[in-house]
A protein has these predicted regions:
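Multi-pass alpha-helical transmembrane bundle typical of ion/small-solute transporters
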Residues: 2-213
């Protein structure tokens, strides 16, 4: 007599049946919702005259800057996701779970943006936002690693794809991670998000030139 499949086997068998395209489409929808929620949090300027409107815009400057930063960040997450999942042909349970964890961080992004835009307690607000990014980027690296190790990618996948993903996403994860301790000393911790990638890219180019020489 054939034994009944275990609950764990049943749970793992179902995600394997999901088409990679369906997960990609679902991810696109979640990211779109996150960006929509991000925009809905923007405060409306108030005032009866142009001068009052300008003063109101200045008063909410931190919210607008935080929105622009998060829009670029979410866009970067989405771009990296598409660059990787365009080459994914199969899924497994672990990859689906990692994907849902990554999507959760995207949904949390509007809340993290609102937190970092508030006044007072800069260290806590900054660290919370940066930690959300570190978790999101780490989950993405784990997804890429699982796709590579379990051969979930198509045969025509460029051989340099995973190296580029690890370098690009890993650099951004390092930038956000480095900014966390810096935030306890200066509000210029934001600069780490730009300086670290620039330095890493410069070092990579210098190394590539040295190898080519």
């Amino acid at each position: 007599m054939t034994s009944a499949p275990s609950t764990e086997d049943t749970a793992d068998a179902e995600p394997r049946g999901f088409a990679a395209e369906r997960l990609t489409f679902f991810s696109d929808a979640v990211v779109a919702i996150a960006i929509t929620l991000l925009a809905l949090e923007l405060p409306l300027p108030e005032g009866a005259t142009g001068a009052e409107l300008l003063r109101s815009l200045g008063h909410h400057q931190s919210e607008y800057v935080s929105f622009l930063i998060s829009f670029v960040v979410i866009g970067g997450h989405w771009r990296a996701h598409h660059r990787l999942f365009d080459h994914v042909k199969t899924l497994d349970g672990g990859l689906v779970r990692l994907s849902f964890g990554w999507l959760l961080t995207q949904v949390v992004m509007p809340f993290a943006t609102k937190v970092i835009a508030e006044d007072g307690g800069f260290e806590f607000r900054f660290v919370f936002y940066a930690l959300v990014q570190v978790v999101a980027l780490t989950l993405f690296l784990l997804m890429a690693r699982r796709i590579q190790l379990n051969h979930h990618y198509r045969a025509d996948t460029p051989p340099e794809l995973f190296g580029k993903v690890y370098r690009g996403v890993g650099t951004m994860a390092a930038a956000f991670a480095v900014s966390i301790p810096v935030a306890f000393f200066t509000h210029w911790a934001y600069a780490c998000w730009i300086v670290v990638p620039l330095v890493v890219n410069l070092l990579f180019r210098l190394r590539r030139r040295a190898d080519a020489a």
